[in-house]
Amino acid sequence: MAVKKAALACSVCGSRNYSITASKNRTKRLELKKFCKHCGKMTLHKETR
C-alpha cells in the first residue's frame, strides 16, 4: 500500500496546521473541521498536496 504525506490547510487563513499520511488510492481531498491556532476557532481544513 502506497502512502503519501499531505498537509491540512485552514480554509480561512491558509496556514498549514496539521500533517497526515494518506493513501494514494483516495481520489477526493480530505476535509475536516479542526482547531486553527491562528484563527483561534474551529474551521474547515482541506488537504493540500
Swiss-Prot record:
Provide a GO CC annotation, any one. cytoplasm
What's one GO MF term for it? structural constituent of ribosome
Q: Which UniProt keywords apply?
A: Ribonucleoprotein, Ribosomal protein
InterPro entries from the UniProt entry: Ribosomal_bL33, Ribosomal_bL33_sf, Ribosomal_zn-bd
Show the coiled coil region(s): none
- GO BP term, example: translation
Q: Which family does it belong to?
A: Belongs to the bacterial ribosomal protein bL33 family.
Name the UniProt record assigns to this protein: Large ribosomal subunit protein bL33B
Q: Which organism is it from?
A: Lactobacillus helveticus (strain DPC 4571)
Gene field: rpmG2
